[in-house]
């Protein structure tokens, strides 16, 4: 307990030093810009999930490894936390009664017969516009709130998604989704449907790697955060000013809370697999402390943020000027992250959802 208290005290001191040294001005998305070559953007998954590269970042030093090495970076009593959300086939295509095409990107279920969505369309749409999905299903636009539309369906929404929906690949993957994506744009531990984007840091894990980790005495916990469509959207001015992002539903149960406390009691690290897990854990701490919770979060983690729980994270490489590159910069330092991204580009790493990964250890 004394060692852990000293550790926490040092971490708090380091946080304030970071604030004083690097984050004494308000940062803008443009401060996180880096040119990612088109050829560095992964367009499809590797044959083997765990054959991706792993950039190990610790105390500012960079080591090139493979993801299959991840067990070597973990210690007994560490707690590895996964996001068990499951990606829905959330992309639909329909047409207006006039014949104009409409692309529908599902965001969140409201009830069995209605949902929130983002739309792309030719011409105009308005309240009452009907969108024909197939001979059995017609959607009707009920209302609009900024970029989101409330849609009423004449069939159960989940049935329509599963029968007609496509895997919602990110816009930087310049191809149509195929049958392989149904499997590979999903973690092997996905359980709870609700996401419209994969928690991509988890895509690298295989059953064999998880078994190796368990045999080492490392605990594996799970939470749920349903990734929303806002994860692909550019940051808006009001988000920067309010320091709030799009809302996403998350839940943490008693079992995970018990695992967190047990790991901390044994001086283990809390290791988040992905930015979604970071957002869920730090939201829990802000709202409850280490207590079960089911809620929505709009937390916007930027440089200067005081991480209360997460000690290390596994994450993919993120879009420049995005909320996610700002989050990892808050964790490791902006210059350190930009340096590691430049190293990754120079050394042939693959970027974004189907790309390679990082293990960021604060030491």
Give residue ranges: language-model regions.
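Intrinsically disordered, low-complexity cationic segments
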Residues: 6, 14, 22-23
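Surface-exposed, charge/polar-rich loops and edge strands
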Residues: 20-363
């Amino acid at each position: 307990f004394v060692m852990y208290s000293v550790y926490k005290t040092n971490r708090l001191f380091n946080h304030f030093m970071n604030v004083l040294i690097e984050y004494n001005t308000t940062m803008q998305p443009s401060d996180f810009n880096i040119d990612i070559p088109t050829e560095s953007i992964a367009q499809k998954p590797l044959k083997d999930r765990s054959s991706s590269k792993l950039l190990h970042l610790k105390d500012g030093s960079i080591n090139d490894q493979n993801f299959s090495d991840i067990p070597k970076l973990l210690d007994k009593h560490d707690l590895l936390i996964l996001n068990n959300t499951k990606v829905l086939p959330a992309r639909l295509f329909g047409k207006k009664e006039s014949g104009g095409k409409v692309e529908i990107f599902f965001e969140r279920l409201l009830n069995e017969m209605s949902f929130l969505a983002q739309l792309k369309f030719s011409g105009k749409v308005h309240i009452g516009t009907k969108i024909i999905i197939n001979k059995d299903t017609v959607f009707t636009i009920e209302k609009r709130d900024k970029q989101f539309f409330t849609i009423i369906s004449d069939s159960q929404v989940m049935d329509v998604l599963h029968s007609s929906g496509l895997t919602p690949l990110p816009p930087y993957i310049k191809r149509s989704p195929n049958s392989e994506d149904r499997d590979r744009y999903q973690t092997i531990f996905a359980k709870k449907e609700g996401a419209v984007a994969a928690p991509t840091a988890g895509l690298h894990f295989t059953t064999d790697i998880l078994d190796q980790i368990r045999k080492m005495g490392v605990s594996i916990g799970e939470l749920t955060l349903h990734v929303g469509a806002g994860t692909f959207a550019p940051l808006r001015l009001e988000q920067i000013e309010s320091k709030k992002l799009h809302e996403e539903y998350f839940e943490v149960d008693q079992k995970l809370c018990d695992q967190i406390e047990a790991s901390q009691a044994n001086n283990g690290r809390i290791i988040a697999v992905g930015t979604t897990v970071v957002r869920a854990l730090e939201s829990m701490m802000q709202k409850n402390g280490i207590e079960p919770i089911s809620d929505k979060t709009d937390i916007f983690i930027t440089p200067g943020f005081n991480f209360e729980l997460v000690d290390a994270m596994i994450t993919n490489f993120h879009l420049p000027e995005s909320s996610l590159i700002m989050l990892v910069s808050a964790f490791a330092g902006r210059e350190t992250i930009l340096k590691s991204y430049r190293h990754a580009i120079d050394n042939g790493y693959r970027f974004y959802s189907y790309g390679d990964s990082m293990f960021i250890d604060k030491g």
